[in-house]
């Protein structure tokens, strides 16, 4: 689960000799998110620093002051859960933020949310963003090499400076206040479809033909 830039730089491969095929979408959508839910979603392991959920909670504490009817749902498990719960208590957000354990039915969370936030400090790929877009959710993501590669110039996504709490809060307000949600949702679903497993398999077949028959 890594992007093309990481493959090329880590393995010292020239661009013309390298072809990256992204991981396929394995979580198939079961419904579609709506703005009316007023719910922000994040999914990932509660590991030390990685997913940046501490950043997200702090940013949400700023955002919710102007959007009090919105909630934040974080799905995951791991060693930082106690830290996140202490932050929720510190900001008195027990009624606005909920932590949920991992579930095989994560589609239910996607389908009943309004936007997705990837607050990671680093990321190899971030398939959860694609899963969210498959459910019609606009995405806010840390400005990382892979998110820039996947989301740059995409109308249903916005990037914020990694770790910048104020900027993330501003991005959440920007998304929450937009009026073109149906259009953004359509764009998100359309883009996520390019990661459908059949299309990824086609990419692999084409690449193998190039290698075997020398048609590169």
Give each language-model segment a name.
Residues 1-13:
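Single conserved hydrophobic/aromatic residue that forms the stacking wall/gate
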Residues 33-51, 57-60:
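Conserved donor-binding/catalytic core segment of Leloir-type glycosyltransferases
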Residues 138-141:
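Short hydrophobic beta-strand element within catalytic cores of glycosyltransferases
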Residues 102, 121:
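Aromatic "clamp/platform" in nucleotide-sugar-dependent glycosyltransferases that forms part
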Residues 24:
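Carbohydrate-associated surface elements
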Residues 153-154, 158-165, 174-179:
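Conserved acidic donor-binding segment of nucleotide-sugar-dependent glycosyltransferases
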Residues 53-98:
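A conserved nucleotide-sugar
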Residues 167, 180-194, 206:
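A short, well-ordered alpha-helix in the C-terminal region of glycosyltransferases
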């Amino acid at each position: 689960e890594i992007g093309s830039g990481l493959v090329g730089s880590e393995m010292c491969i020239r661009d013309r000799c390298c072809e990256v095929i992204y991981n396929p979408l394995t979580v198939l959508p079961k419904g579609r998110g709506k703005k009316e839910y007023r719910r922000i979603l994040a999914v990932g392991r509660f590991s030390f620093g990685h997913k940046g959920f501490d950043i997200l909670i702090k940013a949400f504490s700023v955002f919710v002051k102007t959007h009090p009817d919105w909630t934040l749902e974080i799905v995951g498990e791991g060693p930082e859960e106690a830290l996140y719960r202490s932050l929720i208590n510190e900001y008195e957000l027990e009624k606005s933020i909920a932590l949920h354990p991992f579930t095989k039915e994560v589609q239910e969370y996607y389908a009943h949310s309004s936007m997705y936030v990837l607050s990671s400090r680093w990321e190899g790929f971030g398939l959860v963003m694609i899963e969210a877009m498959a459910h019609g959710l606009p995405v806010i993501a840390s400005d990382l090499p892979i998110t820039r590669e996947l989301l740059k110039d995409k109308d249903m996504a916005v990037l914020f400076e990694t770790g910048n709490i104020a900027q993330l809060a501003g991005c959440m307000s920007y998304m929450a206040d937009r009026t073109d949600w149906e259009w953004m949702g359509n764009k998100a679903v359309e883009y996520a479809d390019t990661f459908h497993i059949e299309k990824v398999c086609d990419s692999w077949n084409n690449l193998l033909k190039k290698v075997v028959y020398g048609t590169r």
